[in-house]
């Protein structure tokens, strides 16, 4: 299924179709984020200073548009390069030097964040989750339609993080230090 999704994405990029920037901005809903800070659990380092940030129902998805394309346009316009369509692995893992943003394009899932001693959070179509480098994540269950996650991973952390999670009257001032290449550590 993900091969088909990625093929569709490639064709749309070549022929120049997809949601317009205006349609993408209309889809964004201002939401107050929920945050969680996880401690090192001995296996998963998590991030000692930056919280996981979860925006519920942050993107209005319509049946007329490819929901994954809306997330791709939104994330790429905010500095998150290299988007891809995939799911969350069913084993605990983390990215030691790269922040990640997840856009749930369809379906619903239960995801454990923060390692085995972390927290299981339900995510649904339209949700956005920002994971700072080191944050463990694992798919526990997903709906039959295969909760479609759009997971851009980038090495341009600071501008992207600030633009994704800033809102009227508030701004997270994060100062991450990381190398320029993505890295995934499986537990």
Model feature map: region roles:
Residues 2-92:
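A short, N-terminal "cap"/entry segment at the start of jelly-roll beta-barrel domains
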Residues 80-81, 87, 106-108, 114-116, 140-187:
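Double-stranded beta-helix
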Residues 87-101, 116-117, 124:
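A short beta-loop-beta micro-motif enriched in histidine and acidic residues
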Residues 95-112, 130:
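Short, conserved beta-strand element in jelly-roll/cupin
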Residues 111-112, 119-121, 138-139:
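Short, solvent-exposed loop/turn segments at secondary-structure junctions
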Residues 123-143, 153:
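Conserved metal-binding segment of the jelly-roll/cupin
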């Amino acid at each position: 299924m993900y091969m088909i999704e990625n093929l569709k994405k490639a064709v749309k990029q070549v022929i120049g179709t997809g949601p317009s920037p205006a349609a993408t901005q209309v889809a964004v809903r201002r939401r107050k984020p929920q945050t969680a800070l996880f401690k090192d659990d001995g296996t998963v380092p998590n991030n000692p200073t930056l919280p996981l940030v979860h925006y519920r129902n942050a993107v209005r998805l319509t049946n007329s548009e490819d929901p994954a394309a809306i997330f791709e346009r939104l994330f790429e316009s905010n500095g998150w390069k290299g988007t891809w369509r995939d799911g969350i692995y069913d084993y605990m893992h983390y990215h030691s030097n790269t922040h990640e943003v997840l856009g749930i394009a369809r379906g619903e899932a239960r995801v454990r964040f923060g390692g085995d001693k972390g927290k299981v959070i339900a995510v649904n179509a339209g949700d956005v989750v920002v994971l700072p480098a080191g944050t463990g994540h694992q798919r526990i269950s997903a709906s039959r339609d295969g909760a479609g996650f759009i997971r851009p991973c980038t090495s341009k952390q600071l501008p992207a993080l600030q633009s994704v999670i800033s809102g009227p009257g508030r701004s997270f001032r994060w100062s991450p230090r990381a190398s320029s290449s993505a890295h995934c550590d499986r537990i």
